[in-house]
């Protein structure tokens, strides 16, 4: 069972079965469509207040040769999100002699990542960056990026994202959502951040960790004895402080930014995931570009993504060192044994979710 926790009232919790499935039947898709419609009402209201509503200022000028893109993201000014977006903006301005310009709106001013993705689905926002785990309701394929221990190391991760398999996954997500995946950001190495010391796998038993409610994650961590819990991002600190949860699965950069180490000073170096973030564009906006503009945008997107990943990896390493400097305790943990324990449960859920073919392709990348 997956725990849903309200840290301000720990008695208010509920559980959902891990058998919860991705919507595949017509009736499920109908319900999802209804939910999306309701969610879009909020998303479009946000878009309207910032001048990005479809039909008003989508970004396309009267001239087919000129375009102003609006790019929303959830990061602050010094994150790889912002720095990568700025790189893309500058490359486009340079390569198109100013025909394609970009306005960047960070700090979630257009809503959280799922809301911005919904705006793109509706054609109300041109571009954004989104975590794959937040769009699995819309794209079953995006679940592949939520599988723990998917990559052998950073080199493998890079080759997957930059190679044919990464392109295939991007195309599948694009086909499922009508939002084009241009390239991949990311690069944070995820670890176990806890108020309790985790130095052996036995220490995981009964540990309540905040995680995203995606099935591969839930199944894997339950196999390790963890109690996966869902807590709103802004309430994690308080939830740990009050003892509602023991910690979370997170990368060093955001552990440092959110000061989680103040209440959860133990970091077990599980490196069970290297984050992937999707650089996306509304299909409607993409279709308004001519062939040469599309080519230029794709080239620039890949350049900006490579730069953003480099920045993210560096920030991640720097943050881990800073966390240790500020008193966080780093603990080695048996990653090989962890992978052995989760292998069979993950094999079953990967097959059940129809991800085996693409998972095998990812693992086969050399």
Q: Which role does the model predict for each range below?
A:
Residues 1-39:
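N-terminal secretory signal peptides that target proteins for export/translocation
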Residues 3, 31, 50-51, 94, ...:
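Short, flexible coil/linker elements and helix-boundary hinge sites characteristic
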Residues 23-35, 43, 47, 51, ...:
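A residue-level detector for conformationally permissive "hinge/kink" positions
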Residues 44, 50-63:
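C-terminal segment of classical bacterial N-terminal signal peptides
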Residues 65-157, 164-366:
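N-terminal secretory/targeting leader peptides
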């Amino acid at each position: 069972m997956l725990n849903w926790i309200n840290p301000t009232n720990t008695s208010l919790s509920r559980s959902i079965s891990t058998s919860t499935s991705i919507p595949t039947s017509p009736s499920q898709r109908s319900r999802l469509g209804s939910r999306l419609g309701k969610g879009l009402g909020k998303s479009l209201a946000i878009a309207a207040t910032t001048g990005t509503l479809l039909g008003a200022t989508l970004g396309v000028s009267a001239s087919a040769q000129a375009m102003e893109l609006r790019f929303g993201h959830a990061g602050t000014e010094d994150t790889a999100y912002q720095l990568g977006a700025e790189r893309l903006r500058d490359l486009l301005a340079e390569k198109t002699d100013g025909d394609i310009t970009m306005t960047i709106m960070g700090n979630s001013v257009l809503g959280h990542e799922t809301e911005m993705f919904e705006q793109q689905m509706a054609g109300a926002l041109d571009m954004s960056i989104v975590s794959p785990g937040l769009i699995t309701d819309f794209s079953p394929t995006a679940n592949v990026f939520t599988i723990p221990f998917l990559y052998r190391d950073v080199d493998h991760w890079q080759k997957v994202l930059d190679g044919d398999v990464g392109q295939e996954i991007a195309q599948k997500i694009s086909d499922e959502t009508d939002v084009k995946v241009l390239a991949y950001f990311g690069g944070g190495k995820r670890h176990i951040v806890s108020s309790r010391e985790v130095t052996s796998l036995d220490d995981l038993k009964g540990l309540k960790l905040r995680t995203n409610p995606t099935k591969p994650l839930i199944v894997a961590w339950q196999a390790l004895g963890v109690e996966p819990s869902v807590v709103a991002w802004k309430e994690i600190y308080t939830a740990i402080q009050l003892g509602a949860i023991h910690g979370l699965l997170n990368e060093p950069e955001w552990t440092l930014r959110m000061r989680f180490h103040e209440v959860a000073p133990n970091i077990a170096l599980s490196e069970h995931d290297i984050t992937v973030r999707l650089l996306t564009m509304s299909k409607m906006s993409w279709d308004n570009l001519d062939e040469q503009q599309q080519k230029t945008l794709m080239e620039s997107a890949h350049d900006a993504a490579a730069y953003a990943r480099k920045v993210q990896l560096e920030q991640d390493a720097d943050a881990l060192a800073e966390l240790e400097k500020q008193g966080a305790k780093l603990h080695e943990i048996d990653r090989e044994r962890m992978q052995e324990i989760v292998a069979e449960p993950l094999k079953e859920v990967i097959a059940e979710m129809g991800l085996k073919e693409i998972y095998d392709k990812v693992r086969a990348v050399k």
